[in-house]
Amino acid sequence: MSYVKDTHMVHNKSKLGNVLIVSAHDPSGAGLQADIETCQALKCYPATIVTGLTTQNTRKLSNVKNISAHDFRAQLETLLEEFSPDVCKVGLINSTDLMASLSNVITEKLPDIPLVIDPILGSGSGAKLFTEEIIEGYLQHLVPIAEIITPNLREVRLLSNGRDVVSSVDYLLGNGCKNILVTDTDPEKEIIINHLFSRVCRQETYEMKRYQGEYHGTGCTLSSAVACRLAAGMDIRSAVRSAQKYAHSAVQFAHDLGWCQKIPNRFF
């Protein structure tokens, strides 16, 4: 009997970039869902650690229920028994206990991988998601070990006690962070202006068309795209440039579901 090889059963064994995602669930499409979609679109494998459950839609956020520190640590340690991430991306983490636990695990078990932090201090609908304790948690546990953080204008000021952008960046870089991508530094303009600051390289400025309307999960999309590009082996500046182009296109082709905010189309 002759054997005919079924070519449809031949699997692509090229290595996927592995991204460890640490964030909260948002039933309306930001948070972990946005992270997962972005990773899939950019050919990376997302392994997710849940920090909390949010009660929200694109119009309002009414509650965040944090996972216990015990359950959080158990998720991490069990996953890392067999999963070897190339990058870790952190989204909403609304507990200093979880921040401390994550910092310990990263330092002890994953000291060589880049850490991408999207410091979510408010929801897209305007809800406040921080206390002074949370701000201090970022500064003590996460910012010092970050490869890059991606705050918007409001967040970078909150993290630095209300300083102007340049002073805020100097403060955060002095706190240990290697790179800072400050997004939408002039919200009143018709274009979006982002700035990348680094401890070792000159500042870069990026300008993009501002699309009309409000969008849900753009920050999650951008920061996860940065993580994916780093997982693919890009240097930080190339990763940031590529991620911004991707996120901008996802907004350009966003889904208008008739909700308060549009949903970025991550598979445009």
Located regions from the model:
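Short pre-catalytic strand/loop immediately N-terminal to key active-site residues, enriched for Gly-Thr
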Residues: S23-P27, Q203-H216
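Charged C-terminal helix
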Residues: N66, R237-F268
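Phosphate-handling active-site elements
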Residues: K43-Y45, R202-E204, R229-A243
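Conserved N-terminal subdomain of the carbohydrate kinase-like
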Residues: V4-L20, A34-G124, F268
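Short glycine/serine/threonine-rich phosphate/pyrophosphate-binding segments
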Residues: S28-I36, C220-S223
